[in-house]
């Protein structure tokens, strides 16, 4: 079911949906429905352009409407929860597996918050390669930031499981009010799913994907960076709608 959901999401966004639509258009063209084939091809390239243009990021980026919080407010929490954000295998000397950019951004912010608040940390996340994200984050927090980890959750495969499995751990210590650390583009969905589990969530959003600022001529010129960030943002909106309205 998890893999089916990922496939359906991939079919909505380029480049897979562009490829699929062009194959469909070619088949239809061969059976002499040429106008319909041309229409499908136009739709395919239009959607590819929209998803590749920076202006789309302006529309999708502002998906976290949580207010900015102060350190005094964060100090009212009982624990800090860091969500896994991806890892990769490396030839760097310090480890065989390392945190990817989004996960490292989360670790950096969480380390700062822990040193300012003194709160215990829980890391959560599974991985298909090598060490789990939960274990890897705990290791890197200690190795690079000299910050300890109180709890490690290493089975969660998605944000919904992050929330559910975290509850199973923290409920034993009667912890309900948490600082939730993830990237800005992921926060809206993550916050909703953790609140659904009964947590009182103080959002702590790390660095963000997407375009910021005002529209300019450059905003309408497609580029690969915009395609990548727009796909991430679209995936998050789809995930939020699915969690909020379907489940």
UniProtKB/Swiss-Prot annotation:
Keywords for the protein's UniProt record, in alphabetical order: Cell membrane, Membrane, Transmembrane, Transmembrane helix
Claim: Transmembrane is one of the keywords in the record: yes
Per its UniProt record, what Gene3D superfamilies does this chain match? HUPs
| Cellular compartments annotated | Cell membrane
Q: Does the keyword Membrane apply?
A: yes
Against Pfam families, the record matches this protein to:
DUF218
**Any coiled-coil regions, as ranges:** none
Q: Which domain of life is it from?
A: Bacteria
Q: InterPro entries under this entry?
A: Cell_Envelope_Assoc, DUF218, Rossmann-like_a/b/a_fold
Membrane topology listed for this record = Multi-pass membrane protein
One Gene Ontology cellular component: plasma membrane
Q: What are its GO biological-process terms?
A: Gram-negative-bacterium-type cell wall biogenesis; peptidoglycan metabolic process
Q: Which residues cross the membrane?
A: 11-31, 39-59
Where is it predominantly found?
membrane
The protein here is known as Uncharacterized protein HI_1701
Q: Which organism is it from?
A: Haemophilus influenzae (strain ATCC 51907 / DSM 11121 / KW20 / Rd)
């Amino acid at each position: 079911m998890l893999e089916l959901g990922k496939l359906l999401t991939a079919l909505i966004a380029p480049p897979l949906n562009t490829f699929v639509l062009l194959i469909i258009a070619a088949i239809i063209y061969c059976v002499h429905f040429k106008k319909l084939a041309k229409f499908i091809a136009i739709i395919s390239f239009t959607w590819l352009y929209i998803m590749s243009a920076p202006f789309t990021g302006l529309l999708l980026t502002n998906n976290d409407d949580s207010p900015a919080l102060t350190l005094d407010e964060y100090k009212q929490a009982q624990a800090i929860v860091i969500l896994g954000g991806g890892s990769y295998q490396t030839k760097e000397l310090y480890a065989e597996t390392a945190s990817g950019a989004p996960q490292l951004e989360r670790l950096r912010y969480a380390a700062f918050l822990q040193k300012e608040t003194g709160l215990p940390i829980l890391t959560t996340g599974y991985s298909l390669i090598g060490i789990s994200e939960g274990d890897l984050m705990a290791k890197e927090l200690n190795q690079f930031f000299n910050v300890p980890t109180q709890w490690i959750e290493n089975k969660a495969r998605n944000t919904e499981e992050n929330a559910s499995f975290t509850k199973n751990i923290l409920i034993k210590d009667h912890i309900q009010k948490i600082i939730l650390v993830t990237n800005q583009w992921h926060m809206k969905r993550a916050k909703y799913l953790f609140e659904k589990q009964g947590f009182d969530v103080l959002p702590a959003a790390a660095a963000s994907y997407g375009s910021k600022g005002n529209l300019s001529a450059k905003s309408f010129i497609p580029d690969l960076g915009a395609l990548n960030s727009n796909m991430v943002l679209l995936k998050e909106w789809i995930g939020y709608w699915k969690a909020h309205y379907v489940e």
